[in-house]
């Protein structure tokens, strides 16, 4: 069994270099919520050195709140902003002799696109128009995945090791109790359930089905590095191969 393990990087965390030795895919911030040209270049070089698949991590323009502010923007604006960010990272990757593999939206852009078909359509169109061979990563079972499929993009359905789920398969908003899983054992058990059994237990106790093609571990988490090591060990023990 294979699984992709991804992390959001280039967001100002000291553990980026070490995480790149543990994950198979890196989602690199493109400057709208975090990062800048130099951090993008540094992350790209480190990812290439470690053989890690590189992806753009576009966001709403929200550096003040790390891309977590809800916004109502015209789809054309979201299309342009997404294209701009993908293009910026793509230029750096190309200049370093690499190939960009995927796009995964960040924060509130990701969450809103999971439920808003118009927003999802704008993002999927931007990815397709930039490079139709790129993989679009989105929340498992979301509108973003459906939009990607409509544009005939290869999609990857994502699950989260350290986030709480609602009964409909969506993430618990960060403003609500149960949004983040701080207990390492619970996060590990949830991840293995999603990957091996295709199910997740919601905060209300209801089990729901989920398709896990890639697992996200947050690079900005306090224990991200230690948890990544534990997760890799758990996968190895169960003959689950981490591969992009």
From Swiss-Prot:
Gene behind the chain: pxpA
SUPFAM superfamilies linked to this entry: Glycoside hydrolase/deacetylase
Self-association and partners: Forms a complex composed of PxpA, PxpB and PxpC.
Family: Belongs to the LamB/PxpA family.
Record protein name field: 5-oxoprolinase subunit A
Gene3D superfamilies (UniProt xref): Glycoside hydrolase/deacetylase
Keywords of the record: ATP-binding, Hydrolase, Nucleotide-binding
Function: Catalyzes the cleavage of 5-oxoproline to form L-glutamate coupled to the hydrolysis of ATP to ADP and inorganic phosphate.
Organism: Salmonella agona (strain SL483)
GO molecular function: 5-oxoprolinase (ATP-hydrolyzing) activity; ATP binding
